[in-house]
Amino acid sequence: MHRFVALALLCTQVLTAGDAALRSALAKLDSLENGTAKRGSIIFFSLQEINSWALYMVPGIVPQGIRNQRVTLGTDTGSGYALMDLLKMRHAEGKATNWMMSRLIEGERPVTVSIHVQSGDGHCIVDLTRVEISGVAAKGAVLDFLVKTFFLPLYPTAKISERFELSYNIERIDLRPAGIGVKIKK
């Protein structure tokens, strides 16, 4: 019984910490979107805030077929990991999938997506550097299919390997191992 109580208390503390990190991340995002972030300031999103956002908010974006999502960061690089069932994700969007393709993408698999970010002067370029499914790198036509079928339907205006203008008065975005810094224009 004591173990159960200790486990329940530990889970409550972890969920409370996650909720606090999520609330902090959402407040920072709100200040960017509403234009209340101080000019010249740097809004810093800790890795804990980013992963808390992913844990709580991704299910609202992708309601089925994804779990255990997490982000790791490096200098100007980032990787997202999740267990994904690509067929469930397609079905959740109401998309039909032909029999052959459904057999290829059915079932939960570990997926890692890695990016490199260049940012400055109010612009950004996000390069897709690697996509791995079950430890196998996706390349060429397979990678194109994955981007067109699963990523672009969620983010139809996304630019991959193309320069785009940052909104919300953002000057640049800096990825670092501890988190992401968002510099606001002066």
Model-predicted regions and their roles:
Residues 16-186:
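Extracellular/lumenal and peripheral-membrane lipid-interaction modules
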